[in-house]
Amino acid sequence: MYMKKITGLMLASVLAMGVAGCGSEKTATEVKKGEPVKIGGLFDITGGTGDVGTPYAEGEKAYVEYINSKGGVNGHKIELIGDDYAYKIPEAQKLYQKLKSSDKVSAILGWGTGDTEALRQQVATDKLPFFSASYSEHLKDLKQSPYNFLTAASYSDQARTVLKWIKDNHKGGTAKVALIYNDTAFGKSPIEDAKAYAKEIGVDIVDEQIVDLKALDTTSQLLNMNKKAPDYAIINQTWGATSTILKDAKKLNLKTQFIGLNWATGEGLVKIAGDASENFIGVVTHAFPYEKDLKGMKDVEEYLKSKGQKLEDKNQKFIQGWVTAKIMAEGIKNADKMTGDGIRAGIEKINNLDLGGLAANVTFTKDNHAGTNKIRLAKVKNGKFEVFTDYISYK
């Protein structure tokens, strides 16, 4: 009996210690007036998507520095604490735990699809609003992703809009389309939705090809694709793989019109692919720095000038990162309490936020965390992307 009592006391003690230990792992408590709001950053600088991840991260950091130079948000400076996780999901999970437990951040600026989807349950448990550079359709599901927000059109919505544009503009019978993507959560994200929508509107998906993010030769895939004679090929890649596809397509003298989703699009593609990028069509979710007449570009130009830089020094992915951080700052501005829950509620108050033309206006509510489904399209002409549509949607 005595031993049972001692055992019970020891068990109670261990449980109490466990509870105390769990308590020490909680995320940040409410930030007091005048204290900085800490935001975590998951960056890909050296990994498989570092070609676009590096300028994107630079844009996020730049906006935070800019808004802090203006006094911050509602008396709070923003402290962005982040690191390179090299596009590796286990490293993203480790970094997330550090940001949550050690740094006590109140929200997260994330990056990839695989890591964002792997973390979404943890993010919900920890009540940390999470903006990702992944525009996976899965993140629209509020039951599974109640703290995730999409700040641009989802990959699936991008693909649907491209297919709608093809349907509306193709001449001569039923359009035949191929899909080219990498074997990652990012690459595969829009594929099933694209196939379903194509069937719905009467566009034929005739082929699919897998191309690695780091591919240096895509000849075999393109030869196989060409057997199906697609009129169009939709690419979901970043600049590196897309440039390889375009260069090999030029060598093979393919007549297919290549159309890339947002991460395949940008100045970096033209720089790498050269003449092979001519007439490539890209999905444009965010403005190019050379669109200088846009109202929102004035703030970017002001910041860069203070650093001795010019708009010409930056690319579209820098603008994309800038806009993402700007939307987060707006959510913080709207928050009644500087906690994860408070910031989420602040983001859900954003209604038709005017981004000065840097991106489509965004709206969030308690029932909808997808800010927009609109994109623009641009074609490479004489080595430069020229936008040829307004903001459009498949709806």
Listing of model-derived features with the role each one plays in the protein:
Residues 1-38, 69, 392-395:
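Short, low-complexity disordered leader/linker segments with a strong preference
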Residues 246-320, 391-392:
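Extracellular/periplasmic periplasmic-binding protein-like sensory domains
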